[in-house]
Design a protein with these regions (language model features):
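Interdomain hinge and pocket-entrance segments immediately C-terminal to HTH DNA-binding domains
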Residues: 22, 31-45, 63-65
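Short beta->alpha connector loops
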Residues: 73-76, 99-103, 224
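Short gly/ser/thr-rich secondary-structure transition/capping motifs
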Residues: 17-23, 77, 100, 230
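N-terminal helix-turn-helix DNA-binding module of bacterial transcription factors
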Residues: 1-35, 309
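N-terminal winged-helix
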Residues: 41-58
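Intrinsically disordered, low-complexity polar regions and short flexible loop motifs
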Residues: 94
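Bacterial carbohydrate/catabolite-sensing allosteric modules
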Residues: 17, 58-63, 81-90, 105, ...
Length: 311
């Protein structure tokens, strides 16, 4: 039966007086849509991830979606709990960048089995067959090595990420192939895998300095690891870049104001956020569209600063 306007107003007033909050889950189940997007990132304290999410949220908000952001803190177990929580909340889709610990893809397959969009950015795996947005990590590593060689470096060490992750695998592949291109030897002693935190950078740098012949350049696959390496070099009195060049990755804000400023890679964070959000919206607006996976690869930029030039 039709409800009169008078009754509607009376009900709304009572709801207001009782501070009534609608049941979001019930509403989502009834409508088949929640207008919520789940986002999983490794760390919120990373400028890369926070600025990607900021642009992503701006685009999604402008289309009526709200974002629920969770962080894995690089833990596979926490990432799995985040996925369960987001699915319970009836999100319309999930946008994620995988934790360093993540090897098993079972929980991501769980998202796919729900029939909702899953978009990966920065860290993703080909085996999942989902939309992906990121940079060309292989070419970017080659660009870094080329720059260091042009500055006169001949023994370039790489503080790498764990190799089960596609992006770090591509970075180390680009590094190795560039060394071959410039007729420089590939030495396993000069490659150290780590979680790329500041302490990892410190430990890796100390290990590299213990070698009989130390490197003359460090290429770290993350800025925090580069910062840790720089701290150790300062503590032992090795001049950067005169005695050792240094390049990081991600263009964290601190890289421009430490001394010396650290050369790094600009991944175009806002652009990744915008394209990732638009890819999600396209999936939502065209659910019956023939499934052609989007693999959008952006070209990164090498920002050359004092830590790696004028050797």
């Amino acid at each position: 039966p039709r409800i009169s306007e008078k009754t509607k107003i009376a009900v709304q007033q009572v709801a207001k007086n009782l501070n009534y909050q609608p049941n979001h889950l019930a509403s989502a189940l009834r409508k088949g849509k929640s207008n919520l997007v789940g986002v999983i990132i490794p760390r919120a304290n990373s400028n890369f991830f926070s600025s990607v999410v900021e642009k992503m949220e701006e685009v999604l908000n402008s289309h009526g979606y709200n974002v629920i952001m969770t962080q894995s803190n690089e833990s596979y177990e926490k990432e799995c709990r985040n996925i369960d929580a987001l699915l319970y909340t009836q999100v319309d889709g999930v946008i994620a960048s995988m934790a360093n610990e993540t090897v098993e893809l079972e929980y991501y397959q769980k998202i796919k089995s729900k029939g909702i969009p899953l978009i990966l950015f920065d860290r993703g795996e080909n085996d999942l067959e989902v939309d992906y947005v990121g940079i060309d990590d292989y070419m970017t590593s080659q660009m870094v090595v080329k720059h260091l060689v042009e500055e006169g470096c001949k023994r370039i060490a790489h503080i790498a990420g764990f190799q089960h992750s596609r992006i770090y695998k591509n970075r180390i592949r680009g590094y190795k192939d560039a060394l071959v291109e410039f007729d420089l030897p590939i030495s396993k002693d000069l490659i150290i895998e780590s979680n790329l935190g500041i302490d990892d950078g410190r430990r890796s740098m100390k290990k590299l300095l213990e070698l009989p012949i130390r490197p003359d350049a460090i290429y770290a696959a993350g800025d925090w690891a580069a910062l840790g390496a720089l701290q150790v070099l300062k503590e032992v009195g090795i001049k950067v870049p005169e005695e050792m060049a240094l390049v990081g990755f991600s263009n964290e804000p601190f890289t421009s104001f430490v001394s010396p400023p650290i050369s790094t890679i600009n991944q175009h964070n806002s652009e990744i956020g915008r394209i990732t959000a638009e890819t999600f919206l396209d999936r939502m607006e065209n659910p019956s569209k023939e499934v052609t996976l989007n693999k959008i690869i952006l070209e990164a930029e090498l920002i050359i600063r004092q830590s790696s030039k004028n050797k």
